[in-house]
Amino acid sequence: MKYRRIKGTNDIFGEEIWYWRYVEETFRNVCESAGIEEIRTPIFEQTELFVRSVGEESDIVQKEMYTFQDKAGRSITLRPEGTAPVVRAFLENSLIDRGFQQRYYYIGPMFRYEKPQSGRLRQFHQVGFEIIGPESPKADFEVIMLVDTFLRRLGLTKYKIHLNSIGCPVCRKNYREALKEYYGRILDNLCDDCKRRYETNILRLLDCKVDHEYSLNAPKSVDYLCDSCRAHYKKLKEYLNTFEIEYVEDHTLVRGLDYYTRTVFEVRHEGLGAQSAIAGGGRYDGLFAELGGSSVPALGFAGGIERIILALKAEGIEIPMKNVHLVYIATLGEKAFMDGVRLAGELRKKGLSVDVDIMDRKLSGQLKHASRMGSRYAVIIGDEELEKGIVILRDLETGDQVEIDRDFAADYIAERVSKD
């Protein structure tokens, strides 16, 4: 039987891995330069955590979660998103004792049972961060500013930040009533999911992928904001304008998770076609209380690594790739192998990437393998070289080679490589 990867998953290797490392390392640098700490949460959680946070009527809970019973009969779900686990960890570990304005970032796999397509897999990966404590629109501004900084640091330019405010529980009551009236007139035209959600969670109709055209003419949340939410949204836009962070007001935007309040945003890249979203986020001031804690304001963002990499490729952005096979040490004989291992250790201490042959191949086979793996240089050590107290350094691109005194080989090779 030939085993194959599960549908909706990917193996990542070769040049592709450098795109992943570039995105992840850039994200870490941006977060840590802004005082955001890393947090790591389990890949699976109690199912109820996501039902309560994401929303029982959301597509994620209704159709997309990987849920199973463990041997103790508990309902367990592979995490479909990263915010709820961070909130759970914050509450369970009493991190509130550290004070307000805490910041945590995460990088890792998420799982949703969707139809696999370009950049949207069943196991996908996200970078994200959460800022816990501040209620001020200054925090909303900082989140969007940091997302913009991260994407620009990657080299991306062909994206737009879509922005909206969906209000708070106070002003959302009137908005729900307006939506009820609007959708009530066209209820017979809606899909079965929307007909059900009309009774249970009217806001989810705005996020329907089947009946999306109806949302274009639906009442807009910004027209129903209370004074506090309207002032919050206005101030956020003032900050963005002052710092020249470009955005597009999009009053059809609600995001697909029930926990959002007030600010929501989504980043869309023009090179990705209809599935253009590469990141998104917003404020979730009621989530801590919903999950059993005290009322704590919070907000955050998540970006899809696969989607961001597609955007990098769409813009033709060159990323740094390190040659992990830079120097290859080819040896002939046991004594030569032992000396090759010692030389490899000396070169690695100087920060070079070095392979040593361990296949007992002929010299021609070793050099062919070195070229195939992309090595720039080969160091050749045999009985004759040992007798003379030298090694041979060959440039595999030009074919030029030079004899080097063994005692100075590590210094010479390191200096030669540094000049390339």
UniProtKB/Swiss-Prot annotation:
Its Enzyme Commission number(s) read 6.1.1.21
Protein name (record): Histidine--tRNA ligase
Q: Which UniProt keywords apply?
A: Aminoacyl-tRNA synthetase, ATP-binding, Cytoplasm, Ligase, Nucleotide-binding, Protein biosynthesis
Subunit structure and binding partners: Homodimer.
> Cellular component per GO?
cytoplasm
Q: Which residues form a coiled coil?
A: none
Q: Which PANTHER family match?
A: HISTIDINE--TRNA LIGASE, MITOCHONDRIAL-RELATED, HISTIDYL-TRNA SYNTHETASE
Xref: Pfam families: HGTP_anticodon, tRNA-synt_His
> Which species?
Thermotoga maritima (strain ATCC 43589 / DSM 3109 / JCM 10099 / NBRC 100826 / MSB8)
Q: Which family would the database say this protein is a member of?
A: Belongs to the class-II aminoacyl-tRNA synthetase family.
Protein localization: Cytoplasm
Q: Which GO terms describe its biological process?
A: histidyl-tRNA aminoacylation
- Cross-referenced HAMAP family: His_tRNA_synth
| Catalytic reactions of this protein | tRNA(His) + L-histidine + ATP = L-histidyl-tRNA(His) + AMP + diphosphate + H(+)
Q: What would be an example GO MF term here?
A: ATP binding
